[in-house]
Structure formats: C-alpha cells, structure tokens
Amino acid sequence: VAPTMYAYQIIEAIKIAKKRGLNIPIIYNSNGYENIETIKNLKGYIDVYLPDLKYYSNELAIKYSKAPEYFNIATSAIKEMIEQVGCPEFDENGIIKKGVIVRHLVLPNHIQNSKNILKWFKENLEGKAYISVMAQYFPTYKAREDNLLNRKINKKEYSEIEKYLFILDIENGYMQDLGEHEEEYVPDF
C-alpha cells in the first residue's frame, strides 16, 4: 500500500487538518520507488518519512517488482526526504518527531543484496537517518513458486545480516526480531 497516487489529496487534507488544530507529526509510509517531484511537493507537509529500500540490484528490482532503476530512483527520493526533514529527532518518550527511517526487508537467498544496502546506508546516510532491518518476509502469491523466495528467511541468513550491521558499526538502526511473523496479521489482498 503506497500513498503516492494520493499525494496531492494528502497535501490538501493536511492543510485542512492543520487549520483545524492538528498538531502531531505527519508520517509518510512509502515503498521508496517515488517520483522525486512528488516528494518535493510534499516539502513542509511531512515530518517523518518511512521509505522502503528493497533492492540494491537493478536485476532483482526488475525481476521481483518490475521496477527499473529502482535503486537510483529510491535513493534519490530518500536523499530528498532527508533534505526536507533533516536528522531524526525524538521526544522524551523516544517517539520520532521528525526525520527519516529507511526500512529494508531481508529476502531469503539474497543476503548480498542486504549487505549492499547496509554498506550504502553506512557510506551515504549514517548520521542523517535511521535504518530498520526487517525480518518479516514470507512468500505470498507468485513468490511461493519462486525457488529463491518460496520461504521465510532463516536464522543463519538473519544472523549474517546482524553481524554485518555490527561490522559496519551502524549506530542509528534497528533490527526486527527473527520470530514468528504470523500470516494471519497480513491482509488477504
């Protein structure tokens, strides 16, 4: 689910809500594959961006999401998001008030993709954004038929990513627990 197609309506809704007294951080949850002009138009309306950064490899992006130039498009959008809202700031309860948290979903059999994403984050965004490494992948629809994606990630794979995160010494990040991510919590699209 992505808000992109409703960006202009979202801007108008935010204007109305703020006129009526809304005073909470506005969060934009994004798949990351965003038109840079759309993101630029959101300047001043969004406090927290939560973009996905799924693929380092253009080959994977095309194969699994039919998203050519995914990495270049997503990282350009993420850099614009950071330019708009700056470094993350948190309230006294640890709740984010403004900033960017880049989310990366680890895919089974594609550990190098995740390592490349983490390395890029360290070299380009460390200190400017947070990263959230997610373990919740499970196969649905056609992924069940793909020999590389037809299972959840395993402990060995996730442990390798966790170790790499520590080797890179990424300080501003989160790692989701590798637990049971029950499919009954996922909508049946």
Model region roles, listed by residue range:
Residues 177-189:
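Radical SAM enzyme core and accessory elements
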Residues 51, 131, 165, 173-176:
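Conserved, mostly hydrophobic/aromatic
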Residues 91-94, 100, 142-172:
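Conserved N-terminal glycine/acidic-rich loop preference
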Residues 1-147:
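Conserved AdoMet/S-adenosylmethionine-binding subsite of the radical SAM
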